[in-house]
Structure formats: structure tokens, C-alpha cells
Swiss-Prot record:
This is Uncharacterized protein MJ0424. PANTHER family: ATPASE (PTHR34704:SF1). It comes from the Archaea. It comes from Methanocaldococcus jannaschii (strain ATCC 43067 / DSM 2661 / JAL-1 / JCM 10045 / NBRC 100440) (Methanococcus jannaschii). The lineage of its organism: Archaea, Methanobacteriati, Methanobacteriota, Methanomada group, Methanococci.
Length: 103
């Protein structure tokens, strides 16, 4: 679950989750942003089916208005040819409706 603490705290939580998912401790120590973090994940999971659910995504949108374009880059450039299912959800319907309606 994402929080409104900071982008850095959310990134650190994703590192912890990806470390647990893959069994690779090095994820916790990576000094990378979202795009490169998902690149590392792709390289580790290879052809495995993986579901990534990002709950309370609206918090990331509040912290960084460009986060949707970052995730579009992650999906198009990194995850598109994988067996990853990326679920973006949250409780603020108004926030998401305005952001996603043109997609």
C-alpha cells in the first residue's frame, strides 16, 4: 500500500516488497528511481507471472504529478513484454477519474 509520506519512502517500500518477492536482498540497497527499480525486477522475474498491485495510487499522484508518465514509461519500455499484471487502484475516485479518463 502506498502512502503520502514521501516518494522516497514509497520507493523504499517497493524495494522491500520486490526483495521479498524475488528473494534477492540487494533490492533493499539499490540507489535507483522507479524506472530502474522495475528494470531490475523485470530482469529477476524473467518469464514468471507476477501481479503487482499498487493500492492508494492517488498518494503518488499527489506527491509527484508526473508519476503517471513514469508508470507509462515503465509499462511501455520495461513491462510490456513480460507476464506482469500491474494493478493501479485507490480510494479517491475523483482523483483517478480525472487522470485516467483520456487513456
Amino acid at each position: 500500500m502506498l502512502t503520502n509520506d514521501s516518494m522516497n519512502e514509497n520507493l523504499n517500500e517497493l524495494k522491500r516488497v520486490f526483495s521479498s518477492l524475488t528473494g534477492k536482498e540487494y533490492f533493499k540497497n539499490l540507489d535507483v528511481g522507479l524506472v530502474d527499480l522495475f528494470r531490475y525486477l523485470r530482469d529477476e522475474i524473467k518469464d514468471e507471472k507476477v501481479v503487482i498491485a499498487l493500492d492508494e495510487f492517488q498518494y503518488l499522484m499527489q506527491l509527484n504529478r508526473g508519476v503517471l508518465s513514469i508508470f507509462q514509461k515503465i509499462w511501455d519500455g520495461i513491462l510490456a513484454d513480460t507476464k506482469v499484471f500491474l494493478i493501479i487502484c485507490g480510494s479517491s475516485c475523483v482523483s483517478k477519474h480525472g487522470r485516467f479518463r483520456d487513456w
